[in-house]
Amino acid sequence: MKCDGTFKNCTNCKKSINCCQEFNKLNAPSISIEEKELINKYYSNFYDELEKNIFTLKTKNNTCIFFKNNNCSIYNIRPLDCRLYPYDIIEKEEKYFLILYKLNCINENIFLNNMNEINSLIEKIKPWIKDFTNKSNFSKMINQEYVILREILI
């Protein structure tokens, strides 16, 4: 599954702290079994088990352990959760929605221009949406402001 993700839009970020360093406010990215196995080919001891078959990347001092020298050291194999951010999928009243977190770091219109790429990715991940949406690791994210972009029909 090829998706460059949204990180390319963050290159002009004016924040002194990168989102990969804000896990006191954000939740550590979720990773699937497949992502865990892929990363495990190169690294060990990098995840915590959240639920059966659902894992999160470890953090140290609120920073992703793969964020080194202002770069992602696993960029080419980074988890889907990282590729999607600041988009996310939430469940409300038994419906699923694509949302965009309101970031104060850049103009959200830049992210809205990525909708074709994101919609294509959403189609590919539909089989796993129910497994990964609104799990217990969503607790910090629920306090973040967001806009609902569209309903996702599963």
Model-derived regions: residue spans:
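Short loop/turn segments that flank or connect secondary-structure elements
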Residues: M1-I154
